[in-house]
Amino acid sequence: SSLVPESNRELPQSITTIFPGNCDGELYMTKGHQHPDPQGEIYYGLEGQGGIILFDGKKTSWLDITPGKIGYIPPGWAHRSINTGQTPYKFLAVYPGCAGHDYQWVLDNGMGLRAFKSNNNFELIEF
């Protein structure tokens, strides 16, 4: 977690690790959140294989993230990270400090997609 304050004009950052595995077939993931002050966010893949489910309340999108790849999350889109590989998935996130984090939005609205183990790969299923 960043020592940079989550305030206007600052750029906090964090490194997240998601271990491989699943619960009843659904791949391990973060809780997901939306930013109350809609701001863009950058994810940079460090290790492993994973991706980001994006949801704006109507449309869904998927971004593959691998080492060295940058993923952009547009303002107003909720996002959740998922480990789609067999090794730990690690990424760096950088976001404006004024953005905030609203986890309740995801509990109330879902994410539009879920990721499930499928043989040696994964499958995205709408819900």
Segments the model singles out, each with a brief description of its role:
Residues G51, I70-G71, P75-R80, G100:
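Histidine-centered metal-chelating micro-motifs
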